[in-house]
């Protein structure tokens, strides 16, 4: 209430920001006459002047008005488009580190030019992030003539580029790149074994296009670089055949809920559709064990080390059958099971679900089951973009998520007014009792509109629903196009003609499509279709000019019919995604219309709407197929979406709390790697680490005594070198430490003299980095296990995140110690042959291919190159099952054989 009163009296934060930009806008408009008088060759000279001013201590704010004026005039000259005042305001907001909400067709791409140009003048680089390669390449090519005139370089990073080309592109003043490629390049850079192989420079300023898609929709999507691991792929085939033998617990037919008392659960497992979780009952675990034994899959107890993984395999198999459906979450294509993006409807080529879920789906679908992967490096988009000194973003829909943007990223949303008033009519939702009634009504409405000639865009949430509607349209004789993950190769053509007269298009989610639907069709696409692509730019422009009269005739005819009619076949979980679909109509002041059709069988209503709605709607007569609008129903629909949005926000916030623990540890590890990469005296670093560790072992002991723990650890580190130590009777701990340091130094000096200082430093660097990477990979797996463990502690009234932070810190402290000790042990015990002269500072270029994590992560396979160092053993190889040489009593494979 107070917020509403304040906004009425002093305006919202967004409106106050807009008002603050007006004086600057007026000054930019006044300077326009100055820019009009400049010759083309003067623009790069003016750019150099602005750069010199910054080097002399001037600020970006003091040169802002001139920079914006120059870039506006450059756009007018090269693109024949003069940015409107609202686009200049949007550019100002982007420079200030805000998120701008601009409606579809209002020119977000051009609005980013001014902010990108201004911030590029510092020389620290600007990154413009897009959601796919097509948009990155399109936008960079589109804006390149503007930046060329201004004298600033522009580059683009695409998924098929090698690291050398990437490095060159990132070195440009302004670089276009997708969020995925940027994240992977950051992870890859921090797995390099040579500083010169790094492609990125310091994160300075970035502009994120479709920022809501990247920082909200994909916030739960960890980027993962992984390597192959030995997995029991046959197990997924074995348990897949057992799914039908297990039974879901019964639900209350009235509420649709399971009994609250555990003893009342009568089945083997429960299903949580909202959280996509399967939980076994005690009875279910007993039945699973009996099944596994009776089918000869295991022998003995299911709870032994060798058998307990079958609980995980079975859980994933049930998920695959009950929660992940073909043509909804994935399709089966030529390359096997392919994930479909929930928000865009596109196939996520090469990505795989993690934790064995993808293998379970492959077993379900009868395709080849691939090996699992282990995580080598990971980061979320939340923490990737928080590393930039300044970030801003743009989208057509951000205001509904303003609270989350502010709380998580400290970013404010500025709603930029349209250049022309919005003429689209947004109709009230039409609500039906069943999905069948709803689809019949949509078909009737589309048929009527199609006969009139008005173009229609029908949005669906899955491939399955798009194919149902397509079949119904075909039966009614409605000529139409279908845009979904199965035919995404025709996307450009389908979207180009979606605004033409009589066009009917069924699209599976329009979020992130990045292409405007123009009334009357797309003139450029129409011309390309007529004259082909092998023509000069001048010929193409002439053909466009000749076609314009016909195009304007079609445009005006479609406009008179009411513009594009958008029909939503159901409500999405997020109001923002619904708004994105609506926003395809009514661009730049064009007329348009939108309406959503909803049924009680839609996932949103079924999972999140109130329990009494179905009986109420039956009483209102809807069971007969009649639609209804009612304030209670509308309110329930809005509340259902808000509940989902709030729940998803809490999930993302919770994820960030866990991820912050990993982030701090990853930052420390990567800082250590960088320090080692730059270090020209790693031998000294290793000796310092050894002295610190020996001192740690001696803490609390008397100087005259040496503990057995100390001796055992010394034995494990120095091994055969202790022969030169002689008797240690009657030697103090401090004297022993000094002698050990002498032995270590002599050992390393001898190796350094053998192959040379630079070569030896490279060898030590390689061993240190290899150890860090290997141990950190194990640590990430341990953190995953810890997270699963602390989740269960909530049942004991313990705070899982507190437990995770405390234990995570403890195992990280052990990791740091283990890295140092295992590196010291290895470099001391290895002998370098005098023929090792071919060893060079080891480079580890990685050939990676993007793969996906369960809720949506991306996994990359890593191919490790072998080192050229020749290693000669000083003693016979120890068998994996023999006692470890350190005296711990463990088998070698479970002790020092791990490293």
Curated annotation (Swiss-Prot):
How does the UniProt record describe the way this protein sits in the membrane? Peripheral membrane protein
Q: Which residues participate in ATP binding?
A: 87, 105-109, 516
Write down the superkingdom of origin: Bacteria
CDD domains in alphabetical order: DEXDc_SecA, SF2_C_secA
Q: Name one GO molecular function term.
A: protein-exporting ATPase activity
Q: Which cofactor does it need?
A: Zn(2+)
Keywords attached to this entry? ATP-binding, Cell inner membrane, Cell membrane, Cytoplasm, Membrane, Metal-binding, Nucleotide-binding, Protein transport, Translocase, Translocation, Transport, Zinc
Output the Gene Ontology cellular-component terms.
cell envelope Sec protein transport complex; cytosol; plasma membrane
Q: Which SMART domains match?
A: SecA_DEAD, SecA_PP_bind
Instruction: List the induction conditions.
Output: Part of the secA-sod operon.
Family under the similarity heading:
Belongs to the SecA family.
Q: What's the protein called, per UniProt?
A: Protein translocase subunit SecA
Q: What is the lineage of its organism?
A: Bacteria, Pseudomonadati, Spirochaetota, Spirochaetia, Spirochaetales
């Amino acid at each position: 209430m107070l917020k509403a009163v304040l906004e009425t009296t002093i305006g919202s934060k967004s409106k106050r920001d807009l008002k603050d930009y007006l004086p600057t806008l007026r000054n930019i408009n006044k300077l326009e006459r100055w820019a009009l008088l400049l010759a083309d060759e003067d623009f790069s000279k003016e750019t150099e002047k602005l750069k010199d001013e910054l080097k002399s201590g001037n600020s970006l704010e003091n040169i802002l008005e001139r920079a914006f004026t120059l870039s506006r005039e450059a756009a007018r000259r090269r693109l024949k488009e003069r940015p409107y005042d609202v686009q200049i305001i949007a550019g100002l907001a982007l420079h200030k580190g805000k998120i701008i909400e601009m409606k579809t067709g209002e020119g977000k791409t051009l609005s980013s030019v001014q902010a990108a140009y201004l911030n590029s003048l510092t020389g620290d680089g600007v990154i413009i992030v897009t959601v796919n390669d097509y948009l990155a390449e399109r936008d960079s090519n589109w804006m390149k003539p503007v930046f060329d005139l201004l004298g600033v370089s522009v580059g683009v990073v695409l998924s098929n580029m090698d690291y050398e080309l990437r490095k060159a592109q990132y070195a440009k003043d302004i670089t276009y790149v997708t969020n995925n490629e940027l994240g992977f390049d950051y992870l890859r850079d921090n797995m390099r074994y040579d500083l010169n192989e790094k492609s990125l420079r310091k994160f300075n300023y970035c502009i994120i296009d479709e920022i809501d898609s990247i920082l909200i929709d994909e916030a739960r999507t960890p980027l993962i670089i992984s390597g192959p691991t030995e997995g029991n792929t046959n197990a997924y085939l074995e348990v897949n055949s057992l799914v039908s033998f297990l039974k879901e617990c019964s639900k209350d037919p009235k509420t649709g809920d399971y009994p609250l008392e555990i003893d009342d659960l009568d089945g083997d497992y429960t299903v949580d559709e909202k959280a996509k979780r399967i939980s076994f009952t005690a009875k279910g675990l007993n039945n699973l064990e009996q099944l596994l034994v009776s089918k000869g899959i295991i022998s003995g107890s299911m709870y032994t080390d060798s058998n307990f993984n079958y609980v995980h395999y079975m859980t994933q198999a049930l998920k695959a059958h009950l929660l992940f459906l073909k043509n909804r979450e994935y399709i089966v294509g030529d390359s096997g099971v392919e994930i479909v993006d929930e928000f865009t409807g596109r196939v996520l080529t090469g990505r795989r679900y993690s934790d064995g879920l993808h293998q379970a789906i492959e077993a379900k679908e009868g395709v080849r089951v691939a090996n699992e992967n282990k995580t080598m490096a990971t980061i979320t988009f939340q923490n990737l973009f928080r590393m930039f000194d300044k970030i801003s973003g743009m989208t057509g829909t951000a205001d509904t998520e303003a609270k989350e943007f502010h709380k998580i990223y400290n970013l404010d949303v500025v709603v930029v007014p349209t250049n022309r008033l919005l003429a689209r009519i947004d109709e009230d939702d039409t609500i039906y009792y069943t999905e069948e009634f709803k689809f019949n009504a949509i078909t009737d409405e589309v048929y009527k509109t199609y006969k009139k000639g008005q173009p229609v865009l029908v949005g669906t949430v899955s491939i399955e629903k798009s194919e149902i509607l397509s079949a119904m349209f075909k039966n009614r004789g409605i000529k139409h196009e279908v845009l979904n993950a199965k035919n995404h190769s025709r996307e450009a053509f389908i979207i180009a003609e979606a605004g033409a007269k009589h066009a009917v298009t069924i699209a599976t989610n329009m979020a992130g499509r990045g292409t405007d639907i123009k009334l009357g069709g797309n003139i450029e696409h129409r011309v390309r279709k007529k004259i082909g692509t092998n023509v000069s730019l001048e010929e193409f422009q002439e053909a466009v000019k000749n076609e314009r009269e016909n195009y304007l005739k079609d445009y005006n005819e479609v406009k008179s019919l009411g513009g594009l009619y958008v029909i939503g076949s159901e409500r999405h979980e997020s109001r923002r995604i619904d708004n994105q679909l609506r926003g395809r109509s009514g661009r730049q002041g064009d007329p348009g219309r939108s309406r959503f059709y909803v049924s009680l069988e839609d996932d949103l209503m079924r999972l999140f709407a109130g329990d009494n709605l179905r009986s109420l709607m039956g009483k209102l007569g809807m069971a007969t197929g009649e639609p209804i609008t009612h304030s209670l129903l509308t309110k329930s629909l809005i509340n259902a979406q808000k509940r989902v949005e709030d729940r998803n926000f809490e999930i993302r916030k919770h994820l960030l709390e866990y991820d912050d623990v990993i982030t701090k540890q990853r930052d420390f590890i990567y800082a250590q790697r960088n320090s080692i990469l730059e270090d020209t005296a790693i031998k000294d670093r290793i000796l310092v680490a050894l002295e610190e560790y020996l001192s740690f072992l001696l803490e609390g002991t008397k100087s005259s005594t040496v503990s057995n723990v100390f001796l055992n650890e010394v034995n494990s580190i120095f091994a055969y070198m202790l022969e030169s130590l002689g008797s240690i009777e009657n030697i103090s701990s401090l004297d022993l430490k000094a002698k050990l340091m002498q032995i270590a130094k002599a050992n390393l000096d001898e190796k350094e003299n053998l192959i040379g200082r630079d070569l030896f430093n490279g060898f030590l660097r390689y061993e240190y980095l290899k150890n860090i990477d290997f141990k950190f990979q194990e640590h990430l797996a341990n953190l995953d296990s810890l997270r699963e463990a602390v989740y269960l502690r909530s049942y004991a009234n313990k705070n899982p995140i507190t437990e995770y932070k405390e234990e995570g810190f403890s195992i990280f402290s052990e990791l740091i110690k283990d890295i140092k000790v295992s590196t010291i042990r290895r470099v001391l015990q290895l002998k370098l042959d005098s023929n090792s002269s071919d060893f060079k500072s080891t480079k580890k270029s990685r050939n990676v291919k993007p793969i996906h994590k369960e809720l949506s992560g991306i996994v990359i396979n890593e191919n490790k190159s072998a080192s050229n160092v020749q290693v000669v053993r000083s003693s016979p190889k120890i068998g994996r099952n023999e006692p470890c040489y350190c005296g711990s009593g463990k088998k070698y494979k479970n002790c020092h054989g791990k490293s």
